[in-house]
């Protein structure tokens, strides 16, 4: 697995190999492990439908394989030891019975315009990939400050005083 940032001394580009399990233990399970490749994220705890499945996985590390029941899951990513969810994803694993895969955490928690956002991608031994869709949440405003206009300026419509548009700038 490739991870890191090309030219960055703190989180340099790197390749990490890992063992690969070809199949789950039975057709009712999916065997998965996690690779944490999000450079600006702390160690994470991963919850599947509110159950802790991976604990304290740090950047550049793989978890051990686990077996989960074939099902659809909501995956919550939290900083290790923190109750606040950083991101949530839909994981439709109901059709993955008997299969295995690696969930790669990739991107940036706080991306710039040219960077990719934080995402989870399931990669299977046969080369299939599935980007897990982010769970849509209601937008809420945390900081409800009032805007108070202190100055208003009238900008002239010269040379045409009959121009039907007037601009008012305030700061």
Residue ranges of model-derived segments:
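Intrinsically disordered, low-complexity polar regions and short flexible loop motifs
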Residues: 1-138
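Glycine-centered coil/turn sites that cap beta-strands in beta-rich domains
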Residues: 140-158, 162-171
């Amino acid at each position: 697995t490739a991870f890191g940032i090309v030219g960055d001394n703190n989180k340099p580009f790197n390749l990490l190999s890992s063992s690969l399990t070809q199949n789950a233990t039975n057709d009712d399970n999916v065997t998965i492990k996690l690779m944490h490749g999000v450079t600006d994220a702390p160690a994470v705890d991963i919850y599947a439908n509110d159950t802790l499945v991976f604990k304290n996985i740090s950047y550049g590390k793989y978890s051990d394989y686990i077996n989960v029941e074939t099902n659809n899951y909501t995956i919550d990513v939290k900083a290790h030891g923190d109750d606040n969810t950083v991101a949530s994803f839909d994981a439709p694993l109901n059709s993955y019975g008997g299969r295995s895969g690696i969930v790669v955490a990739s991107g940036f928690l706080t991306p710039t315009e040219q960077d990719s956002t934080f995402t989870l991608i399931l990669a299977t031994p046969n080369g299939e990939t599935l980007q897990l869709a982010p769970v849509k949440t209601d937008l809420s405003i945390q900081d409800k400050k009032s805007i108070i206009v202190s100055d208003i300026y009238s900008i002239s419509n010269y040379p045409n005083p009959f121009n039907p548009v007037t601009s008012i700038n305030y700061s």
